[in-house]
Design a protein with these regions (language model features):
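ABC transporter nucleotide-binding domains
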Residues: 1-179
């Protein structure tokens, strides 16, 4: 896979915007490669610069710094060859989809299946955590109740004081479960 052609290479991309005498660093030193046939995702929190990165790559913004290479050719702002290459890539994609619509449907089905599996796994993990929390809470309440009963026994009856040690041990064991 490392021998695959690099379609898009982004090196130290910077996109700054001037705002009332100061600079907003929307994108700062972002680098990545996208190889032919590779599925690439740019993910992050809201407002972290994903859209700005994309817009900078397709030249909706003149980049502040860094380099962008498309099929090995360095792209400069507004370069006609780059715009033609992007246009051709879009046409190639549309032609590929038109020639094989089943592939697009199959890919969507696979993506939906993967998302459903991940959602199910997350729900199961949350359910397990909730059950674990409930069990821990129940054990802690039982342990505290036994400790309270042991204290009452110690205060009221010297014979019951012998039970205090064993219930304290049980209380400690229940309050700190092994999981």
């Amino acid at each position: 896979m490392s021998n695959q052609e690099v379609l898009l290479k982004v090196e130290n991309l910077c996109q700054y915007f001037g705002m009332q005498g100061s600079e907003l660093k929307a994108v700062d030193n972002v680098s990545f490669d996208i190889k032919k046939g590779e599925v690439f995702g740019l993910v992050g929190e809201s407002g972290c610069g994903k859209t700005t990165t994309g817009r900078s790559i397709i030249k909706l913004y003149n980049i502040t710094g860094g380099n962008i290479f498309f099929k090995g050719i360095r792209i400069s702002a507004g370069k006609r060859g780059y715009q033609e290459a992007i246009k051709k890539a879009r046409e190639d994609y549309k032609a590929a989809v038109a020639a094989n619509p089943e592939k697009k449907v199959q890919l969507k089905a696979e993506m939906d299946k993967t998302i459903a599996e991940q959602t199910k796994a997350m729900k199961e993990a949350i359910f397990d955590q909730n059950n674990c929390d409930k069990e821990y809470s129940k054990r802690l309440q039982e342990a505290c109740k036994m400790k309270y009963e042991a204290l009452l026994a110690r205060a009221s009856d010297s014979e019951k004081a012998a039970l205090t040690r064993s219930s304290r041990t049980r209380c400690a064991r229940l309050a700190r479960p092994s999981w």
